[in-house]
Amino acid sequence: MKILTIAIPCYNSEAYMEKCIKSMLPAGEELEILIVDDGSTKDRTPQIADAYAARYPEIIRAVHQENGGHGEAVNAGLRNATGRYYKVVDSDDWVNTKSLIRIMAKMKELEESGGVDMLLANFVYDKVGAKHKKLMRFKNAFPVNEVFGWERMGHLHETQYILMHNIFYRTQMLKDCHLELPKHTFYVDNIFAFQPFPYVEKLYYMDENLYHYFIGRDDQSVNEKVMIGRIDQQIRVNKIMIDVIGEQDFSTKDP
């Protein structure tokens, strides 16, 4: 079994998806890369996905589906994942290769003693035109390089966020908690990050600057004008997360 599956949701991503894929390939055959083509029709995304799958059959698989939005691409990745851990990397983002290799080595080591439910790392805001890249790290909130539970988590600063970018989840745990993101909805990465929390018992944090979160495309979901136009979808996602809280029974949880 592979140690890690990384799903790359792609929708008309020809211009940048190869940079994303190439940043992972040196991690080798312990990694499974799923390029999920979410019904791309305007460029060569499907052909690029198939070409990489043919060239690196021991690492890459191409998954083609009718357009269902980012959430359904994440769902498709999870359905097809064979790795012990699961991560999503958006097609316009990329990872630090050396950090990925070190994280995968630690995953293998952790598996020898039962593994963890959630592994966290750092991420970098890679904003076009910014003089300095903003690094999101968590040494103040999490023990470093040791297995721990929620009771040992410190306080996050107001500007610190646990997002899809810095999370690896145990694949079977995601399936056991029946994680399924809504179709044709933006900002569902918040649900991906949040919904599994009640099922997480063992965590591990590595102070690795792994994920480069690219900010700069005009059509990007985090573009201010785009976000204003999609406020209804943000409200929908927030309601879903509130419902998740309402479904949990915290009466038997340790304080």
Regions found by a protein language model. Name each.
Residues 65-81:
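Glycine-rich, basic loop-to-helix element that forms the pyrophosphate-binding segment
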Residues 16-18, 41-52, 94, 98:
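Acidic helix N-cap motif at the loop->helix transition within catalytic regions
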Residues 30-40, 61-66, 91:
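Short beta-strand/loop segment that forms part of the nucleotide-sugar
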Residues 70, 91-204, 211-229:
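Donor-binding/catalytic cores of nucleotide-activated saccharide
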Residues 86:
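Short aromatic/hydrophobic "clamp" motif used to bind/position activated sugar donors
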Residues 23, 37-47, 69:
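A conserved acidic beta->alpha catalytic loop
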Residues 214-255:
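C-terminal subregions of glycosyltransferases and related glycan-biosynthesis enzymes
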Residues 13-26:
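Short, well-formed alpha-helical segments that are part of the catalytic scaffolds
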